[in-house]
A protein has these predicted regions:
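Phosphate-binding glycine-rich loops and adjacent basic patches that engage nucleotide phosphates
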Residues: 1-10, 37-44, 64-71
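Charged alpha-helical initiation segments
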Residues: 1-32
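Short, well-structured alpha-helical interface segments that form or flank functional binding sites
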Residues: 12-19, 32-43, 73-80
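Short alpha-helical functional segments enriched in proximate histidine and acidic residues
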Residues: 27, 47, 85
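Short, contiguous, well-structured surface segments enriched in hydrophobic/aromatic residues
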Residues: 32-60
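Long, charged low-complexity segments
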Residues: 63-172
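C-terminal non-catalytic accessory extensions
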Residues: 166-193
Length: 193
């Protein structure tokens, strides 16, 4: 029975957020289903927002990185997709207009990665490599993200990093990522008697 006896283990907010973030990063780089990915991405964003308010730590928000003229559209599409997936009871026959959900996931995951460092003062291999992945593979990132010009100039130094397929092939083979992945997916925690 699931509820008999003591819990198998406990996780704190930091570990939960890290696991959601790492899962989202792996899903994005592996080019997995964007709808399932969106749920983990938005759960991480919600956790960051709630922790930020509770701990009094400022985090990076959409308002700081999305250009003002695109902010309302961003919010509408991002929230509509999440609410559609979360609240089937509201209108079970409704269809969802799908825009660039993978792009929304990639951008929100970048914010989640930055916010993990702000909230917990830590970086992981997943976070460092995801930041490089996003910067290298997002051809239109400069159109909607307010990063300093030096950031964009620096990307031109690494033209071979633009292929998402290359990242998909090598990401999990990077030793630091492999180590974090094994920790994140250690199911012995769930199966201990």
């Amino acid at each position: 029975m699931i509820t008999q006896g003591p819990p198998k283990f406990e996780v704190n907010r930091e570990e939960t957020y890290r696991r959601l973030l790492h899962f989202s990063v792996r899903q994005i780089i592996s080019q997995e289903d964007p709808f399932g990915t969106h749920l983990s991405v938005k759960a991480g964003a919600r956790m960051a927002s709630d922790l930020s308010k509770h701990l009094g730590i400022e985090i990076l928000s959409h308002e700081q990185v999305i250009k003002p003229e695109l902010l309302n559209e961003w919010r509408r599409i991002n929230n509509d997709t999440y609410n559609y997936l979360k609240h089937a009871e509201r209108d079970p026959h409704r269809s969802l207009p799908v825009f660039d959900l993978p792009l929304l996931n990639r951008l929100q995951t970048l914010l989640n990665a930055v916010n993990f460092k702000s909230l917990f003062g830590k970086q992981t291999a997943h976070i460092n490599l995801y930041t490089a992945y996003f910067s290298a593979t997002e051809p239109d990132a400069q159109k909607f993200i307010n990063f300093p010009e030096e950031f964009w100039l620096g990307l031109k130094l690494f033209p071979d990093m633009k292929s998402r397929e290359s990242w998909k092939t090598v990401f999990l083979d990077i030793p630091e990522v492999q180590s974090e992945y094994l920790k994140d997916t250690d199911d012995t925690l769930f199966s201990q008697q």
